[in-house]
Amino acid sequence: MSYRLTNPRIISTLGACSMLIVGLGFPAEGATTPSSTTKSSGSSVPGGSTPGSGNGSSITPNQCTYRSVNITGAKKTQGLPGQYTSGYSKKQNKLYVSSAESGAAESTNISTLARVNPETLQIEATAKIPVVPDTENKTPNLKQFRAPLGITVDDEHDLIWVTDGLTYSVSAYDINTLQQVWTSYDPNKKRNQQTIQHPREIKIDPVTGKLFVTGTGMYSIDPKTKEIKSLDYPKGVYDSFGMHTALNSADRELYVTDWGTDEVLVFDADTFTHKRSLKVTGAEQTGVPTQPHGIAYDNSLGKLYISVQGSNGINSGIYELDKNTGHVKDYVKHGYLSGALAHDEERDLLYIADYGESKQISKDAGNVAVFDTRQNKVVKDVRVSPSEVNFLTIQGDGSVVAVSRDKTYKNTNVDFRIDPTTGEYQSASVDEYPGKESVNITANTLSRFKAEDAGTAPGETKRIIDPASAPEQTRLVSDNTSEAATVSAPKTVYAGQKFTIGGSDWTYGEDYLPSDITVTLDDGKSKVNGQGEMTFKLSEEETSFTRDIEVPADWKPGEEHNVTISSGKTKGDKQRSLTIKFKVEEYNPKYIDSCTVPAQDAVQATEVPFAGYPKVGDNAS
């Protein structure tokens, strides 16, 4: 069922403006609800579940088991200011971490590329990064770093390839000296004129050796000729922003998550032509943005996985998608903002981090989930930092390194900083920038752990609503135009239950201020707790939301009723109004047994002493 509001508006970059009214059933007393009603035969509760078949089906204790892992060597320590990503060299048995900190201004004047001991996490060397004019700043003659963000290690050629999201370039560093040996950066061009726009991730195709770079669009680089090609990105894509890639070796397909369009784009890895786009629909709320982030393709199992950030905690989690249609085959809720993802294909394990946000309360923030791809279950959580885990890397021994941006370590003194007025290196614990307020330099958490197989363990059998018979939560209705405000709704609500109002980007004005949402039932004639009209005030951070509303007690099966959703009561707000009719039906769900992973506390990483930073440019060989 699809509707369009009478007054269209411009969509913000975070997602399509939408409003949802969704049917939400609640179970009988003593039963357990799934965390979503995605039409999946697999897991649908936190941690993953394996449902039985048919109404009243039972699972024996011998059938209800899950893969058990032990977490060893979980440690954390002080890392780098502004650290972003990392890469592992099997040949060198070393970890490399990028750092790009804006500090007191938008330009970067704190930056390095660090070599790190993969076991102790001791920082062994920090590189001197090239300094260039800050052409984007209005103040003349200022300097900035060409700061590393994305990293991939090229052991065959003893190189570290890095992306720079500030000068929009890709560079190669000698892995032994940590000195730049090539760059795509053209000093005669401004940032928006560079060949590669907004580069982020960089990866090597193990078959051809060519490099894939995500950004605003998609690019390939021939490491021998240094030729840069733009992949056949879909024309007219709105707010595209490529994030991460995965390669299907058998089909030679490259999968790319696009955070801006809520899609996974599929390219021919050899011809670079666009083959299809997979729309990623929210497993909890279809009208709320999914914002796909990490991605992995398990070639041995033939499974395509993505991590989804969602919006304000909605839709966040681990998705298994049909590689041809994008249909959500399975969904496991995890965290407030699922982001960084690493894939150990040999062991059939995924590692997914909850980025969380320092301003938001999320019990899983800073957690990394250990996810078994054989059963689609989260089998363990490891808390590696207070929040904002940005990147995960699997090392040669199977251990996982987590790079966070949590700013835990205050008043950090570094010598990989430049004076922006001179471009000269200068040791400091306070960052200063002309015309800006000075800020203390803070460092982030660097952590490591290893998940070791420990056989199987008994799970817990719970009664859940059969996902196949549960009320459908939403109906996708967006027509994907840049100015259309759309609404989705169920055709039915259920007597004695609740329905959920959800939405995304209900804002007004150039500053995208949050609207106040007003809901009335039967033009105010039907009441809930004596109220015929309900107004929801959204916070500034609440770009997406859900609100539960009880079905009025006098609504009986077989009747038709309506709900009106509107905004515009706040001064300056845009006036929008829509009335939706639906039927009331009796709620009679089916229940099945489900095998779940027992609740368990996250393993805590232990703090280890920080060994300090070596002098910048030393110990690089």
Task: Label the predicted regions.
Residues 550-556:
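Short, surface-exposed loop/turn segments at beta-strand-coil junctions that are enriched for proline
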Residues 1-32, 621:
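Secretory targeting and sorting signals
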Residues 488-493:
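Short beta-strand segments of immunoglobulin-like
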Residues 557-563:
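Exposed beta-strand face motif in extracellular beta-rich ectodomains
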Residues 603-621:
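Extracellular Ser/Thr-rich, low-complexity/disordered mucin-like segments
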Residues 31-477, 597, 617:
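Predominantly soluble domains enriched in secretory-pathway, periplasmic, or organellar proteins
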Residues 501-505, 620:
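Aromatic/hydrophobic beta-strand junction motif of beta-rich domains
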Residues 539-548:
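Aromatic sugar-binding surface patches on proteins
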